[in-house]
Amino acid sequence: MPELPEVETVRRGLKALVLGQEIVAVTLKVPKMVKTDLETFALTLPGQIIQSVGRRGKYLLIDLGQLVLVSHLRMEGKYLLFPDEVPDNKHFHVFFELKNGSTLVYQDVRKFGTFDLIAKSQLSAFFAKRKLGPEPKKETFKLKTFEAVLLSSKKTIKPHLLDQTLVAGLGNIYVDEVLWAAKVHPETASSRLNKAEIKRLHDETIRILALGIEKGGSTVRTYRNTLGADGTMQDYLQVYGQTGKPCPRCGQAIVKLKVGGRGTHICPKCQKKRP
């Protein structure tokens, strides 16, 4: 958490709140969050104007013209905008003071979030180095490529979907939902999937992540959008967090198990494990 739908919702909120604003000062309380040169980060950001707010997978891209501030929220990161005085909070770690008098604050209970300030010309190389897969859209997420990679891999399907190389943006919540919708057991070896299963995984990834965006993300644990509001996708989750409840498709009780060290929710009847 947050996954692609939540990050996209944050992106839209940031765009509505800070587009066109000039950064006049930056205060950084947790230096380890910045993965590029600290001095450059502190000295370069003041005077920059936020020209657009984009997203690639789970990364937010704050476009400053020739530079891009790449923000990864990791487990608990979120942005808040205060029009005047900023309240004390030990979890507020980065403060972007804006020319209109407001302050954009990055909050992160776990302190896992990261910032990279890079030249826009280096953005493609930045993501290539991380082997980030395509966006989950029909135009970019090609079935034939997805199929070829899966059938040549010995990885288990759930960890494979989570590693961001097949497709960008899936996390634990949405992988469980995709696997249930596609009727695939999470411990199935990628290479043992048949073509019909692969097509279902492909199509359901696109559909479910789009639904997550439409519903403003899933509010489980601490997620809120930039405007402080909850998402509603949690009301549409079929298996994640539904342990003991009847499967919406067949009525069998949803069970929780561990796959690749991650809590995983499945229907044991709809998602049969291969012998």
From Swiss-Prot:
SUPFAM superfamilies: Glucocorticoid receptor-like (DNA-binding domain) (SSF57716), N-terminal domain of MutM-like DNA repair proteins (SSF81624), S13-like H2TH domain (SSF46946). Its EC number is 3.2.2.23, 4.2.99.18. It holds the Pfam family H2TH. SMART domains: Fapy_DNA_glyco (SM00898), H2TH (SM01232). The active site is at P2 (schiff-base intermediate with dna), E3 (proton donor), K58 (proton donor), R262 (proton donor). Binds 1 zinc ion per subunit. The keyword DNA-binding applies. Monomer. NCBIfam families: fpg, PRK01103.1. Belongs to the FPG family. This is Formamidopyrimidine-DNA glycosylase.
